[in-house]
Amino acid sequence: MKLILTQEVTGLGAPGDVVEVKDGYGRNYLVPRGLAMRWTRGGEKTVDSIKAARASRAVRDHDHAEQIKTKLEAQPVAVKVRAGAGGRLFGAVTVTEIAGALADASGEQVDKRTIVVTNPIKSLGAHEVSVKLHDEVSAVVALNVIPA
């Protein structure tokens, strides 16, 4: 099934990309959630308009992403969590908690889907997470997990 992506889909593409996916994935997941629309000959105009809008935002977004990166990397971010004896956490620190802590510390709203945690954070102390702000800009944020 040929689709036009209307939003970024991890591992598949960016808005405006024409992709070929299995029928069930397109029909049951991508299209109902508004992540893609069916490809038609008239849809080529939609692709062109999406790509033109994306190109015009690219330079502005890159500069803005650099500014946010500077803010995020300037200071460590503290996340308060419940912990047991020995510094072991009850569960793991989620990307939602990290996004909230980043918003509190820097004043910038960061989408939780852009936060990349390589290993689950299950202990107190210093950790690092990366935030993909733009195709070419990633920020490595120092995260300090402290007991609540």
Curated annotation (Swiss-Prot):
Keywords: Ribonucleoprotein, Ribosomal protein, RNA-binding, rRNA-binding. Belongs to the bacterial ribosomal protein bL9 family. Binds to the 23S rRNA. One of its GO terms (cellular component) is ribosome. Pfam families: Ribosomal_L9_C, Ribosomal_L9_N. This is Large ribosomal subunit protein bL9. GO terms for molecular function: rRNA binding; structural constituent of ribosome. The gene is rplI. GO terms for biological process: translation.
